Design a protein with these regions (language model features):
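Condensing-enzyme catalytic core mediating Claisen C-C bond formation in acyl metabolism
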Residues: 1-49, 143-205, 284, 291-360
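Cys/His-rich short segments
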Residues: 348-414
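Short aromatic-glycine-enriched beta-strand elements
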Residues: 420-432, 476
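Short nucleic-acid-contacting surface segments enriched for D/E, G, S/T with interspersed K/R
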Residues: 447-461
Length: 489
């Protein structure tokens, strides 16, 4: 008898800043007064140094807290906003997570249901697979999409019990998919923004007929009724549509999950998995969870929560990220960080950021994974790792072993706030930090203000964009330090 496959762990990442929709509407009301109906609530916005890859890394770290990463056999990254068309984006996530080299990696894109499709593909196997979905979409200013969308990522680890990754949190009961070239919106490879069709047609033909029909077919195929569903995840941002679809399938109203539209926004390919993570945090053993994905067809997956369901206390998850939200009303900064407003940067911004591929490859563990060195003779920890250690009392060669620092807590030793150097979000904070257990690094700080920074303040490391080589369209990544907040592991 084969062992059950399902969800072993889950995690999420939502940027701290929440742009108030009222601020967006206030700036654009003169031109688009019809947007008033969308002006309530807030949407999650990434900072200038975040993208699909960095958010995917943070969601994965949340998911894999306390787990043996060497057991993971594959990774998939689902997104409609991958930074590279010809470079394995999931490979970047793999390097940042310090996963084993002998695994499979693939990118899933081209549809907002890329996340659910990647999840089905992983669940149809037997080896531990990490499925990550993230999106950071651009929308034209004064458009409905600018108000409705949000930035986020979610990660789901699937596999079987007994693979060294704990017990199943939810058992996979089956899935059903249809593929139809229904073009509710599209974006070509050369375009920055989506082009969408009329909303009523999308609702009637797409949501009601295609997604609604797929939901009914899935319930029949999987041998359950709507009344059996305890959590219905229907990631459609249009008000009333999830409730209407659920009613047509016999699903009770209280089973329909909150879409997170008011506090996060529609996070694209990541949204079904983000809502799934939120449901798993609150589910009770035995609960049946129905997950849908929509985009040029539809996916429907069915899970049943086990006795191990719930969010481990050391993880932030969706609830933890929602709790640390920071309200933001600076619409101009949002436009600038999105590349939609060209501000005068001055001569200090005129730098050649070319990244030699040779040095990046040689130092990929240090740059991408923040792996330092620890001397096996003296125990001295340093970054970066070198052939000869920094301990003045022992200059032996070849005694250092790899020593990952990304998950270590550090404390500020010295710092400065630099208003002269160019930064997309001035002033730039940086300083020397000492890691618990040893090791010192001069690091740039992120997600902080003047009141967040002081000597002795605990910091944790996050994977971010270091700089962008605009001449060659190449993104340089590294690790930055952010203030530790309540709930951080």
């Amino acid at each position: 008898m084969s062992r059950a496959t399902g969800i072993l762990a889950f995690g999420a990442y939502i940027p701290q800043r929440r742009l108030q929709r009222s601020a967006v509407y206030a700036a654009n009301a003169w031109f688009a007064p019809g947007l008033k109906g969308q002006s309530k609530g807030e949407r999650a916005i990434a900072c200038w140094d975040e993208d699909t890859v960095t958010m995917a890394v943070e969601a994965s770290r949340d998911c894999l807290t306390g787990l043996d990463r060497t057991a993971i056999a594959g990774i998939s990254l689902a997104s409609t906003t991958l930074p590279y068309a010809d470079r394995l984006n999931s490979g970047l996530v793999k390097e940042a997570l310090c996963l084993e080299t002998n695994l499979t990696a693939n990118d899933q894109t081209g549809s907002l249901r890329a996340g659910t499709s990647a999840l089905i593909q992983a669940l149809n196997g037997t080896t531990p697979q990490l499925v990550v979905a993230a999106d950071l979409r651009k929308a034209r200013p004064a458009s409905e999409g600018e108000l409705v969308q949000g930035d986020a990522a979610a990660a789901i680890l699937v596999g079987q019990a007994g693979q060294g990754l704990g017990e199943l949190a939810a058992t996979f009961l089956g899935s059903h998919s249809v593929t139809i070239d229904f073009v509710d919106h599209f974006r070509s490879t050369s375009a920055d923004f989506d082009y969408g069709w009329e909303s009523r047609w999308i609702r009637d033909e797409g949501h009601t007929k295609i997604l609604g029909g797929t939901l009914k077919e899935a319930l029949t195929k999987l041998g359950v009724t709507g009344a059996d569903i305890d959590h219905a995840i229907i990631p459609i941002a249009v008000r009333g549509v999830p409730e209407s679809l659920a009613k047509s399938c016999g699903i009770k109203p209280e089973a329909v999950r909150d879409s997170l539209s008011a506090v996060v926004g529609d996070s694209g390919a990541a949204h079904p998995l983000l809502m799934l993570a939120a449901a798993l945090e609150e589910a009770k053993p035995g609960d049946k969870i129905l997950l849908a994905g929509f985009g040029q067809g539809a996916d429907v997956l069915l899970f049943q929560a086990t006795d191990s369901v719930g969010r481990p206390p050391e993880q932030l998850g969706v609830a933890g990220h929602l709790a640390r939200a920071r309200k933001d009303t600076n619409y101009t900064r949002f436009l600038f960080h999105r590349g939609l407003l060209d501000l005068e940067k001055g001569m200090r911004a005129e730098m050649d950021e070319k990244q030699p591929g040779t040095s990046l490859y040689r130092n990929r563990k240090a740059v991408m994974g923040l792996v330092g060195g620890r001397c096996t003779k003296t125990g001295t920890v340093q970054f970066p790792k070198t052939e000869i250690g920094v301990n003045a009392n022992d200059r032996s060669q070849g005694t250092q072993e790899d020593y990952p620092l990304a998950d270590k807590i550090a404390k500020i030793v010295t710092y400065t706030a630099d208003s002269l150097s160019f930064s997309p979000d001035p002033p730039v904070y940086y300083g020397a930090i000492d890691f618990e257990g040893g090791g010192r690094l001069v690091a740039e700080f992120a997600d902080c203000s003047a009141e967040d920074v002081e000597v002795g303040r605990e910091m944790r490391m996050v994977f971010r964009i270091k700089a962008v080589d605009h001449a060659r369209d190449f993104t340089k990544y590294f690790w930055k330090a952010v203030p530790v907040q309540k709930g951080d592991a």
